[in-house]
């Protein structure tokens, strides 16, 4: 949160299990509504300046992220193998590779993207929407995370990500990559935890301008109605 690893308001821990061996490979804290409040506050504060960055600055930032991702590529492969129980070859050739591929594709799209263009007698200007809440699943984590996150960065948005509590470590590793790449504090925030607590708190937060969700039907049914109570809150499922 805001560029720092911080102690959660909760003392509850979640075991992260390698499904191939059924061994506990580590633990993460089950976050709280208070943790989400801190993360959204940091993202909202960062948005005031990050939204003003130029396309060229965001292109440079994505290039830096790609470079740092490549430096940690083997770490992504190893952690995905452990938290998903995936074979090494699959983690390397598909899981980790898809993550960096998504960032490359976003970068290519950004280079040619027109945020401002004439439309007849008018000028159409596309502006970043604000703080985006993101919820991602366990089974293809880097694909889902990088698809959402890289697009938000390219648009000039800030974000709070709740990764799956089943496979949270690749998101935490990505946070290290972003920090090393120079992503400004507060632009990318990660809060681990369960959907009914952390996910719900994120989707109903008044300062979240948009929700992007990929996951189970159960979780989608829970998130969508809460988001739609904010009548102007776009929600993509």
Task: Please identify what each model-predicted range represents.
Residues 115-231:
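Rossmann-like NAD(P) dinucleotide-binding subdomain of oxidoreductase/dehydrogenase enzymes
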Residues 232-236:
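A short, hydrophobic C-terminal helix/tail in secreted or cell-surface proteins
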Residues 1-120:
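N-terminal Rossmann-like NAD(P)+-binding subdomain of aldehyde/semialdehyde dehydrogenases
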């Amino acid at each position: 949160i805001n560029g720092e690893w911080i102690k959660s308001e909760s003392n509850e821990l979640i075991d992260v299990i390698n499904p191939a061996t059924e061994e506990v490979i580590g633990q993460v804290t089950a976050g709280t509504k208070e943790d989400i409040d801190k993360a959204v506050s940091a993202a909202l504060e960062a948005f005031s300046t990050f939204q003003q960055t130029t396309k060229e600055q965001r292109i440079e930032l994505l290039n830096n992220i790609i470079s740092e991702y490549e430096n940690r590529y083997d770490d992504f492969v190893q952690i995905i193998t452990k938290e998903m129980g995936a074979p090494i070859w699959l983690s390397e050739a598909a899981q980790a590779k898809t993550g960096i591929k998504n960032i490359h594709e976003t970068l290519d799209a950004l280079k040619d993207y027109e945020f401002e263009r004439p439309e007849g007698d008018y000028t159409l200007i596309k502006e970043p929407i604000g703080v985006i809440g993101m919820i991602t699943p366990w089974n293809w984590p880097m694909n889902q995370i990088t698809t959402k996150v890289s697009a938000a960065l390219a648009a000039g948005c800030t974000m709070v990500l709740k990764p799956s509590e089943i496979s949270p470590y690749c998101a935490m590793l990505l946070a290290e990559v972003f920090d090393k790449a120079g992503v400004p504090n507060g632009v990318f925030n990660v809060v681990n935890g369960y959907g009914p607590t952390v996910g719900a708190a994120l989707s109903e937060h008044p300062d979240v301008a948009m929700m992007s969700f990929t996951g189970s039907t159960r979780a989608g049914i829970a998130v969508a109605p809460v988001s739609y109570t904010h009548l102007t809150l776009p929600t993509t499922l």
